[in-house]
Amino acid sequence: LSEKMDIAALSYMEQLGTRSDPSRDPSQRTVATAYLGLVPAQVKTTIPAYAQWVPVDNLPQMAYDHADIISEGVDRLRAKLSYTNIAFALAPPDFTMAELTHLYQAALGHEVSPTNLQRVLSRRGQLAPTGQRKAPGTKGGRPARRFRFTKQTLQVTDPFAILRPS
């Protein structure tokens, strides 16, 4: 993927699994090892004309078992967002809670309360304020505080947690 999509800045990668079902490719026996790779939101990529980013809930028709592999990756990410600090791999170095909430909502596929998200992540020791604030917008109001993740490596933060729609 990094060669085809000009993505050199993977912030996290793990093996999803190896598939070797004899019927996965009707023309020959193939073995495929799939990986979950995360790219930080702020990374800009050059996408070739033959490719495009698509929402995971609106995938095009795919060959073989590729849709199943993607579904497995999405499920793995969603689960890990509940009990680890894996969001560090999606977020920029510093962010507002609104920006982080947007990342969680996009990954989880449902609404997330910014207040509850901040409370949970702070209680787990995942967030630290940077002391900076976002530049004020045109609508006025208090500028949003900026945060960063305390760790940039994967850690289990709550082995019994689950984030789900209320």
What are the language-model segments listed below?
Residues 102-111:
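Short helix-coil junctions and helix-kink-helix linkers
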Residues 29, 63-64, 111, 115, ...:
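Non-catalytic, surface-exposed connector residues within folded enzymatic/regulatory domains
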Residues 2-45, 79-87, 124-133:
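Active-site segment of metal-dependent pyrophosphate-handling enzymes
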Residues 23, 92-94, 137-139:
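A short beta-turn/loop motif at secondary-structure boundaries
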